[in-house]
Structure formats: C-alpha cells, structure tokens
Amino acid sequence: MEQMNRHDGMPTAAKRKRIPYGLMNFMTLRERNCYYVDKTRFIESIEEANMCFFFIRPRRFGKSLTISMLQNYYDINKKEQFDKLFDGLYIGENPTPERNSYLVLPLNFATVDAGLDNYRAGLDNCVNIGILNFCDRYKQYLPDDIIVRMKEECQGCVDQLKFLAAECEKVNQHIYLFIDEYDHFTNKILAEPKHMVRYREQTHGEGYLRMFFDAVKDATSSSLTRVFVTGVSPVTMDDLTSGFNIGTNYSLSYEFNELVGFTEEEVRTLLTDYAAVCPFNHTVEELICNMKPWFDNYCFSVEEYGKTTMYNSVMVLNFLDRYIRSGYQIPKSMIETNIRIDYDKIRMLIRHDKNFDHDASIIQELVTKGYVMGNLVENFPAERINDPDNFLSLLFYFGLVTIDGSYRGYSRFIIPNEVVRDQIYTYLLDTYKENDLTFEEFDKDKLASKMAYEGDFKPYFTYIADSLKKFSSQRDRQKGEAYVHGFTLAMTSQCKFYRPISELDNEGGYADIFLSPLCDIYEDMTDSYIVELKYCKSNTSDAQVQKLFKEAAAQVSRYADSDLVKESVKTTRLHQLVVIYRGVDMVVCEELKYECPDVCGAAGGA
C-alpha cells in the first residue's frame, strides 16, 4: 500500500505527479514533476507542414501549453536543457534536425486591449514588450545596439517587426514567431455589432492589424522562418489572409485532430497512472463512464469521424483534481466555472441566431431535434456571419457543436457533451430574461429536490410551464412545438439531479425527454422520469387532447421498457409522465395510468 501524506487536510499519495490543471508553461510543468500527456509526436508533422501554421480550437483546450512545448523545443537558448525537458517523451528519443535552432518570438494577443478606439496602442504595446524581451533573451546573438537603434528608427510594432527581421538576417539568425489568441479582439467585435465598421478598418486595406500581418508576410522572405498562429475563430483569419496569404489552416486536418485535447486512450492511461498511486474509490472504467458524457465527443476532422473523439483536456484535469481533493468522491458538479465559454460570446451567437431573416433558428433546431445539417466552412468574413453555414461553422469552431457524420452531401452536427449542452441551455434561458424577469432559483431548487427525493413532479413542471408562458414572445409562440420543447429542455438541464436526454434513440423509438438520474453523485436519490412531451395548437379541443394523451401514453410505455432506460435508472423509481401543452398552456401533467386525465387549464394564445 502506498505511503500517504496529509496536505491541507486531504490525503495525497507520496508518489503521484502534480495535476497540471490551468498550467500553460511547459518548462514549469516539467520542473515541478507534473503529469504530461505526450503531444511531442506531432512536432515531426508540424515541421513537415507549411512554414506558416494556423490552428483553431475552442478556448481552454490546451493550445497554450502546446505552444509553450513547441517554444521550449525550438528555443536555441534551451539547447543545454533539452534532455531535462524532453527526457521520456517521444521527441526526446526522436529529435528533429530543427530542434533548438531558432530565436523564439512569443506574442499573446490576449494582452491586447480589445477596445477598437485604442487598439493600435494596445497592439504596439503587446508587440513592443515581446520584442524587447526577445532582444534581451538573445542579446548574445544580436547586434549590441539593436534596442537603441530600434527605439530611434521605429514608430510602432509594424516598423519594429520589420527592423527585427532585418537585423536577425544580418547575423544569420532565424526567428520562429508564435502568436497565441490572434483573434482575441474579434470576440469584442462580434459581441458588439456597433464595432463592425471599426473592425473592418483594422483588418482591411490600411488597417493596422492588417499592416502587422503584411509585415509578418514580408519578414518570411528574410529571417522569419516559421510562424505558428492559434485562436478560436476563423473569422479574423479570413479578413486577414488576402494579405497574409502564405499561411495554411490545419484546423480541420485529420493529421492534427489529436494535437490538443485528450483521446480516450490518453484519459484511460492518465486515470490508470493515478489509480496506481492513489486510493481511488472507483475503477478506471467507472470514472470513464462518469466523465465521457460530460467531456468527450469532440471531432475536428470529417475524416476522423467514427475513429477518434477528443476529450476537453482542461475539463478532464479539473475533474481529476477535484476528485482527488474531495477524498476520491465524484464531484457534485461536473462543470467548473472557469471552463464556461465567454458569456458575451454565447449571447452574440444567440442574438445572431434569433435575427436570421429566414426565421430558421439553428440553435432552436439543435436543441429541439438534437442535430442540424449543414456544410463546414473553413473560414469566412465577419460580415457574413449570418449565412447559415457560416454561423453553424462558427458554432463548430467555438466547440458548441461537433461532427457526427454526413448525410446526402451535408455534415451532421450535434452538441458534443453535457457541459456544452448546459452552457447552451443556460444562455438560451438568459434570452428570456431580458425584460428584468428572473427565475426564483431557490424555489426552483427546492422543487427539483422534491421531485428527485419524493416523487413530487407536478410542482416542478408547473413551475416550468409558468416560466414558459411568462417569458414567451409572440415570435416564440409562433414557433409552437419547437419553442415548448426547447424551453423545457433548457429548464430541465438546470436541474442538478438529472442529465436530460432529448429524443432518446433506442429500440422503442424516440422519447422527448429522459431525466437520467445522476446516482453516482446523489447516491440517495429515489426518483427518475421519462417524459413524453406533446404540443397542440391553442384551439385544440379537449377530446383531441385526450386522444393525444392516449398516443403519448403508449409511446412512453415503450420507451420505459428499453434496456438503456432500465440500466440508467439504477435503483430509482421510474415515473412515466405525459405532459401536453395547448399553445403555451400546460393542460396535462400526469403520471401514466390507465385512464385519461381531465384536461386542465384554458386554451392560451399561441
């Protein structure tokens, strides 16, 4: 049995490596004996790729750590530390000819002030600091007076980059430029439509950002030998690439599908390694079963569909860290606040989605049907974000949908996992709260608890019905069934006791909503639910509603007999419910019995 120590009141194994949650510095990771999932095998492929490498992935997916790893590998100053940094890793045994041969210039545009009114000053400051640090780090390779002359001759970052490239060429040194979060300021633009004109000024013609990337392009003809650029959106790339037209976007390449994030094999190895030195209360397989629905299922290449899906690495490390620090208990919440996608970005997406002229809400369709069909666009300009395929592609790049196959020439996209589903539903609900209307969270939680532990479901679904009617607009009512279904799903997704599964595909057919109980987290909960949700127009008669109830009752009985449902409910008591809306009024909310209920409520407008 492993020797155990106590640290901050929590048991930790003496031999276990540190969990690198939130760590973006590769050298620090290696020096502090942190666990590292080896991605160095991709260095060979990156070297064989175009000299200017563009790579787009969702935020908090491990991009910055990968960039840091590459910087340490290519840095000429780290030559003597190569064995220390890369011993035991793939590239340590298989080094490439270009290792430790570059002067590395790292720039992180996340530090640039996103305000367009002073964007030039922010970009100048970011690049100036980067170049000054560069000159200090590599002073033994550069002319002695390079900083003095640069200050005398250069007015901004465009001039500085040109000057630096020319000086390095004189002394026969090669630069590897890394730009992390190149599109950081674009998020502000997309969230605020009023800034679109200024955005175009920066990225087109004589715009300053455009001029900077033109300078990067020019420098590649001298000492700037390699460029590696990352971000989360292809929008700015499209607006810049007509000037910077030597870069290649490898974001959708099957060769780099696994460059960031974890494969299931990597997650399994990670858990196995920690289980060997920590007193886990669960098997590796049990932990995988808990993690997979929440963190897995990203696919970034059409060619890789059905072969390899990716886990969000930050989510996995956060889960493992909380699991160990809680005494090896499954965390009560599978979602950590730092993982949530930027609030303004989601609101922007929903706003654009609601403003489609054709009134075909992609997000509404995604929530209601569970999938959408479309074409994945590699890059597109900001002014064309409302084109359906462009908008869908933006959802993909942000990590809100993922590839799930193809059909009749179109790609099929789904929500990848429960963490993303929670975010979409949460912010979708926020769009119904824009008129100073708020949910009574405390009351809602109490109702959810009674449903999970006492089988008292009617107050909870009545609460949803009241909220639905309260927040519905005339446009929402026109959407009818899609609105009712989407709103109900969004509300049930906020219930901490269940994982709502929409349109459950099994041998019995399709169930509208299965509230799968999170028994691994709430071991004492007693009740689970499968809900057949029906909708009819506001002028539907009571007799027609009762006929609809009989149809729903037959359907929900078949769903309840499926193996998937039986396995998921575990020791809970499964309630088979029928909920019927007439317009925006809930007129039936009954547990399945053998006689039709009385139809309640009056017909509402819809």
Pin down the residues of each PLM region.
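Structural recognition of the conserved hydrophobic beta-strand(s) that form the central parallel beta-sheet
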Residues: 176-180, 210-211, 225-232
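Substrate-engagement module of ASCE P-loop NTPases
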Residues: 163-171, 198-225
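Amphipathic alpha-helical segments of the small helical/lid subdomains adjacent to P-loop NTPase cores
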Residues: 236-243, 250-321
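Walker A/P-loop-proximal flanking segment of P-loop NTPase domains
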Residues: 3-78, 83-92
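Domain-level recognition of nuclease-like catalytic cores that cleave nucleotide substrates
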Residues: 564-606
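P-loop NTPase motor core
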Residues: 22, 38, 75-136
